[in-house]
UniProtKB/Swiss-Prot annotation:
Its cofactor is Zn(2+). Gene3D superfamilies: 3.30.70.360, Zn peptidases. This is Peptidase T. The keyword Lipoprotein does not apply. It comes from Streptococcus thermophilus (strain ATCC BAA-491 / LMD-9). Keywords: Aminopeptidase, Cytoplasm, Hydrolase, Metal-binding, Metalloprotease, Protease, Zinc. The active site is at D84, E177 (proton acceptor). It catalyses: Release of the N-terminal residue from a tripeptide. One of its GO terms (cellular component) is cytosol. InterPro entries: ArgE/DapE_CS, Bact_exopeptidase_dim_dom, Peptidase_M20, Peptidase_M20_dimer, Peptidase_M20B. Its EC number is 3.4.11.4.
């Protein structure tokens, strides 16, 4: 269904810079997210007639309730999207609207960059549709401004059509998802629903209840610097230690060589000098045993290297980040089955695949609210090639409305 103001709402949100900052220690990490919540979203929720609208300074979430209008619909269902955007330029976002896309190359403004089907064959799925792209100088922010716009549009549709019967709805717009800390302080008692959905997925039909289990590994390599001309038997090159460590990890377990249910070890940064070097990894797997084995491999390599040198040359710290929410959701698949049934009723083919990443829903699920993820429409997210289909966004609104009105 076409919805008035969905496009306008998304464009307005997308133009606001709400980039998060992984180096900040406050919550939210940027003031722009607070301003977006209080100055843009909160007044809109008030205008739409929601109740119990409140901003939680403790965690940066803006929360509101739409009471049920049918006593027979007793569920309490939440919808959650994040306000921040990824680590890419978000200042001066100037979206392009391409109506009736013809399948060709889309110039991204005057930037010299193009959306080319030869590079992005997923464009062929959108011929004839209205696409919103960047101008090539910023990201778009469909992750997750599209989700916010879809939730708001569903609420506006309910206000304009009070005859539509629905259960109690709770909405939550949160911070800092892109840097992995947005749901750390999520208040499940305040949100108070039976289950929820993050509206934070990608293409049409995505329905996800499995994420990676995730950890981060930080390594410090301690070298000994002497003049290279007299280094034999004396120098210990910390950079070489970092290389040696990396080369002992399974060569095939890298992101660029894995897909589906395969996990990986990803070297994100390696910096240093002969005297000291640092490496930072992320560790990902879907299965608990494999996840634990990966972490154990890191420790075994560090221990072996320290033993070989007879002293501590490698310091390793591993911290778990989040866990596969399947462990929670598979105990009661009703939220997944409900969304699947609604999609099928709407003629949408559910695409049930694992998320090769994480969502706020993972941490929220482990806090006590099962929270699978549904599509929001974005493609090529986190950069200048990001785009979203208006028609996919409309169908996401259809799914939200179907979920809250399903007996």
């Amino acid at each position: 269904m076409a919805y008035d103001l969905l496009l306008e709402r998304f464009l307005r949100y997308a133009k606001i810079n709400t980039r998060s900052d992984e180096n900040a220690t406050r919550t939210p990490t940027t003031q722009s997210q607070v301003d977006f919540a209080l100055n843009i979203l909160k007044p809109e929720l008030e205008e739409l007639g929601l109740s119990n609208i409140h901003y939680l300074e403790s965690n940066g979430y803006l929360v509101a309730t739409l009471p049920a209008n049918d006593d027979r619909l007793t569920r309490k269902i939440g919808f959650i999207s994040h306000m921040d955007t990824a680590d890419f330029n978000a200042e001066g976002v100037s979206p392009q609207v391409i109506e009736s896309y013809d399948g060709g190359i889309i110039p991204l403004g005057t930037s010299g960059y193009n959306l080319d089907p030869a590079d992005f064959p997923n464009l062929q799925n959108y011929i004839g549709q209205t696409l919103i792209t960047t101008d090539g100088t910023t990201l778009l922010g469909a992750d997750d401004k599209s989700g916010i716009a879809e939730i708001m549009t569903a609420l506006a549709h309910l206000k304009a059509n009070p005859e539509i019967k629905h259960c109690e709805i709770r909405v939550g717009f949160g911070p800092d998802e892109e840097i992995g800390i947005g749901a750390d302080k999520f208040d499940v008692d305040d949100f108070d629903v039976d289950f929820a959905y993050t509206v934070d997925g990608g293409p049409l039909g995505e329905l996800q209840y499995e994420t990676f289990s995730a950890a981060g590994a930080e390594l410090i390599f301690h070298g000994r610097n002497v003049h290279p001309g007299t280094a034999k038997g004396q120098m210990v090159n910390a950079l070489q230690l970092a290389i040696d460590f990396h080369n002992q990890l399974p060569a095939e377990d890298r992101p660029e060589l894995t897909d589906g249910y395969q996990g990986f070890n990803h070297l994100q940064t390696m910096t240093g000098t002969v005297e000291e070097a640092n490496s930072s990894y992320i560790i990902r797997d879907f299965e608990t045993e494999s996840f634990e084995n990966r972490k154990a491999t890191f420790q075994e390599i560090a221990d072996k290297m320290n033993q070989a040198y007879g002293q501590t040359r490698v310091d390793l710290v591993i911290k778990d980040q989040y866990y596969n929410m399947r462990q929670v959701i598979e105990k009661d698949m009703m939220p997944v089955e409900l969304a699947k049934e609604v999609m099928e009723d709407l003629g949408i083919v559910p695409v049930i695949e694992p998320i090769r990443g994480g969502t706020d829903g993972s941490k929220i699920s482990f806090k006590g609210i099962p929270t699978p993820n549904i599509f929001a429409g974005g493609e090529n997210m986190h950069g200048r090639y990001e785009f979203v289909s208006l028609q996919t966004m409309e169908k996401a609104v259809d799914v939200i409305l179907g979920i809250i009105s399903k007996p």
